[in-house]
Amino acid sequence: MRLYVAPMDATVVEVSGDGRVRFENEEWTTPTLQERRAIIYAAEIEVAALQELMEILESGKV
């Protein structure tokens, strides 16, 4: 996984089942409330962009 989180200028590369994250070139850490919110926001934006891509490709209008 690679998720760029613009407000933090950081990239999430792994997430554990207990909620810890690993940012690129860093060790595992438990994100603060602000960091969690920033990660969730970035993920929601990425999901929306991927959904739009899927809709375009599935419509066959490429």
Residue ranges of predicted features:
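Alpha-helical coiled-coil heptad-repeat register
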Residues: 37-54, 58
